[in-house]
Amino acid sequence: MQKNNNAMIKRIVDVCMTVLLLCLMAYQVTGEALHEWIGIGMTILVILHQILNRKWYGAIFKGKYNPYRIATTVVNIALLLSFVLTAFCGMSMSGHAVPFLYGMTNVSFARRMHLFMSHWAFVLMGMHLGMHIPVMIARMKLADKQRMVLSVLLCIVAGIGLFLFIKNGMPGYLFFRVPFAFLDYEKAGILVFLENILMLTFWAYIGTQVAVLCRNSQMKNEEKKNPLLPVIFIMAAIIIGLVINMISGGISGQDSGEGGWNSSDTEVMTSSSEEKSVRISTSISE
């Protein structure tokens, strides 16, 4: 009974963390003060998440490592690291939730590192969630055809998510190329959340297919069914996203500057005298 209760608590914490992550990535909707308090809430949930999963850390140096365990361990540790740095840098710029921690480190550096690590946390959180999906799908006991249809539909959705990821300029944050956050304050709040969900879905889909690929590598040859199918699905999702991006780019180029990321509908979050800094999302861990 206690085991079931612990599992339920873990699931609730996971769901709450995912919801808060989506809120943190919607800075233009929540505003600065609420963004900081949501970040504090996320920090508390992540600490609780580590406590609930403390046995995982106790077993990290025990047993053999198969491809799936290697992949999940790398993602989980990278996710925890990205969260710690995101939270630290966010608190170093805080003007509302924990203003007494302002200036713990250079604010200009903290701003760029916060953007950099928070977007990596978003990517890694998606992959972390996705790597647990095959287990949940297995419990649904779907027929092979049903599973294939579901995979194809999710592949299309993931492709749309990749398109939005590119359109919103996310890759620039991942490679430490963007010093300030470019946010569209004219976009409807519901659309911001929908885009965040779709972008997260892309990385969750990648995580799912990586997990399936790792598990396939552990099977005997006679047990494997379409072992390269996960690779095909990943490539298909990427191609769908790139094609939509190319088509969208061509259309917006003919649309007299409307749509996309134009200076007329995009605000650059700047900091004057480094007294106010951009805060974009605190997140996550295993």
Located regions from the model:
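Membrane-embedded alpha-helical bundles that constitute the cytochrome b-like, heme-associated redox core
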Residues: 1-286
